[in-house]
Amino acid sequence: MRRYVLIYLVFLSIGISRKTIVKLATLAPEGTAWHGMLIDMGQEWKKASKKSVQLRIYPGGVIGDERDMVRKMRIGQIHAAAITTEGLSEIVPEFSAYFVPLAFQNSKDINDVTEVLLPSLEQKLEENGFILLHLGELGWVYWFTSKPIKTPMDLKTMKIFTWAGDFKWERLWEKAGYNPVPLASVDILSGLQTGLINSFSTIPLYALS
């Protein structure tokens, strides 16, 4: 399973003016390569617009989790967000197709599915007031745990991070006999330090950050 980062802009949320400031939120921690790419993008925007468009980045989840970002885009507090499929499924539930465990064996599988699904997903995003600006891949999702896990049964002894507010996945974990612990993603580190959780799944880039 591969996680995607996508950047969206709400229709008509930014008025036309001589100087436009685009407010963009992301979970990417400040100082990481991920954050650096957004800074570079902002510099390109500034150069291309002759300084009339400036990108203001809110990194590290300072304005909240991805669901908060989506909500704040809808009410115009921010204009864009670099989000994963977790945030996207809040807008268009069909993005949950990318969550299915072991459904994708390689990059070709991902590309083939995306080629078929993306036109309809983009249309549904636009119907909900969002525009896709960029689609990028950050890598495969892995499990990170406080002790070795070799089988799905081993994972049943762990306290598993789940995204706060994602009730459907929380119920699925519970129904399968696991122990989900809903948390905001910005609280993963403190949750690990206090023992509130001891396992989570993400891409290596985010885990190292």
Where are these regions (language model features)?
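Sec-dependent N-terminal signal peptides
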Residues: Y4-L12
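N-terminal secretory/targeting leader peptides
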Residues: I7, R18-K108, L125-S209
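A gly/proline- and charged-residue-enriched helix-loop-helix capping module
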Residues: K108-E122
